[in-house]
UniProtKB/Swiss-Prot annotation:
The gene is dtd. Its EC number is 3.1.1.96. HAMAP family: Deacylase_Dtd. The keyword RNA-binding applies. It catalyses: glycyl-tRNA(Ala) + H2O = tRNA(Ala) + glycine + H(+); a D-aminoacyl-tRNA + H2O = a tRNA + a D-alpha-amino acid + H(+). Belongs to the DTD family. This is D-aminoacyl-tRNA deacylase. It comes from Nitrosococcus oceani (strain ATCC 19707 / BCRC 17464 / JCM 30415 / NCIMB 11848 / C-107).
Length: 155
């Protein structure tokens, strides 16, 4: 599971001209679900997101977590994060989880986020979205949770 997190002052997601999610100060997290990802990877990512210290303390050091500053969390599915860009001039999306599984894992991640943290919003899996945000800093990090080891299958 791959996450690109950005510290923001505000963000919103629009689908078909309608704003479906909006947050104030907090984190926007673009999430790429890979083959082999499941609930354990979602749990580990969420654990890290809620405790990752990317907000400034009184001395200006990145020492405070999202929960410490009572910021908001906006999670947005983005399968392109799982692309293989190693060869050629066109990305391959083979490493990304198949859409039904990706949706299931993303929805699980968001449900767990809402259960653990009240200030959550989400983009819509499979939708063409417009994401607008004001990056604060800018502060941007990638987090990777390795997928479970897959065994070869014969078809």
């Amino acid at each position: 599971m791959i996450a690109l997190l950005q510290r923001v002052t505000q963000a919103q997601v629009t689908v078909a001209g309608e704003v479906i999610a909006r947050i104030g100060p907090g984190l926007v997290v673009l999430v790429g679900i890979e083959r082999g990802d499941g609930p354990p990877q979602a749990e580990r990512l969420l654990e890290r997101l809620l405790s990752y210290r990317v907000f400034a303390d009184s001395k200006g050091h990145m020492n405070l977590s999202l929960a410490d500053v009572e910021g908001a969390l906006l999670v947005v599915p983005q399968f392109t994060l799982a692309a293989d860009t190693g060869k050629g001039t066109r990305p391959s999306f083979t490493p990304a989880a198949p859409p039904p599984l990706g949706k299931q894992i993303f929805e699980y991640l968001f449900a767990q986020a809402k259960a653990r943290y009240s200030r959550c919003a989400a983009g819509r899996f499979g939708a063409h979205m417009q994401l607008s945000l004001t990056n604060d800093g800018p502060v941007t990090f990638t987090l990777q949770i390795p997928p479970a080891v897959q065994t070869a299958t014969t078809e």
